[in-house]
Amino acid sequence: MRRLLAGLAVGSFLVAASACGSSGGGGASDKNASSGGTTTVKVGVIPIVDVAPLYLGQQKGFFSKRGLKLSMTTAQGGAAIVPGVVSGQFQFGFSNMTSLMIAQSQNVPVKAVVNGVASTGVAGKDFGAITVKKGSPIKSAKELEGKKVAVNTLKNINETAVRESVRKAGGDPSKVKFVELAFDQMPAALDGGRIDAAMVVEPALATVKSQGATEIASSLVDVAKDLTVAMYFTSTQYEQKNPDVVKKFQEATAESLAYADAHPDEVRQAVTTYTKIPAATLAQVTLPKWPAEPNRASIEALEKLGAQDGLFKSTPDLDKLLP
């Protein structure tokens, strides 16, 4: 298992020490973290717009009224969060579906427990896109052949999505040169010409647009209609030992998703509490969708593309992985 986790983390956890939101205790179980009827749970998240409902739900008391207190810690991507959850560093984590399917294909004990975020399903109006700097001669995904394209994690959901955009545009994805960069480092790298294109998500997408960048493809839309991009998950051990905490987390997160979907202005404000997005750029952020349930058909499409890209050691069992 240790070897599997090391592989998932690609050599390092990449977990930032910055605790966003409420501060929490160590990596103890919920029993040890419980005080005065409140259970503190550590959640591994990514500092992107996707997780805004969790911060907003904490502010609105959706978790506290169920006896939960969230301690959020940021990481670069889902691939870094999976080992943290399985090892007990986090009780819950936010991860894209490809990372979860990769983990399960390696027999890592993960279980998705509640929906996370979905694409808007509208090309040109999604929260993630392939972008090129102002004045770039690149006009379509086909022209990314031989070019350097940044993704937040190699051999994962965004690389798969970019590959699909290149295929759909008539290009050869095997000729694209992928490089790994954190989302918040992409605007400067793109503007400085260190990369030719970047697959960015909000709020970094709004930042690159403010620098004059242009979208050339909505890769998440290219993968599948209304793609379920990510979900919140736990380890199978934690789910079995702490069913009450898992149920409370599911309920509070579901309430948070529904509230976020109906209150976009409050979502934008919540984003400022855990990212460095300038106030002037905030209004330009394209929000994703936060549906109550995952879209299984879209996850199956993502699974097929991941298999095509050679990401899985065995076929992921979606019946076991999904709630």
Q: What is the meaning of each model-derived region?
A:
Residues 1-8:
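Bacterial N-terminal signal peptides that target proteins for export
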Residues 15-19:
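C-terminal motif of bacterial Sec signal peptides marking the signal peptidase cleavage site
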Residues 21-24:
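Bacterial signal peptide processing site
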Residues 27-168, 180, 226:
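Short, glycine-/small- and polar/acidic-enriched structural segments
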Residues 94-108, 163, 196-214, 305, ...:
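A ligand-binding cleft/hinge motif common to bilobed small-molecule-binding domains
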Residues 98, 179, 184-270:
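Pocket-lining segment of extracytoplasmic ligand-binding domains
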Residues 239-311:
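Secondary-structure end/capping motifs
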Residues 307-323:
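Conserved C-terminal helix/tail region of periplasmic/extracytoplasmic solute-binding proteins
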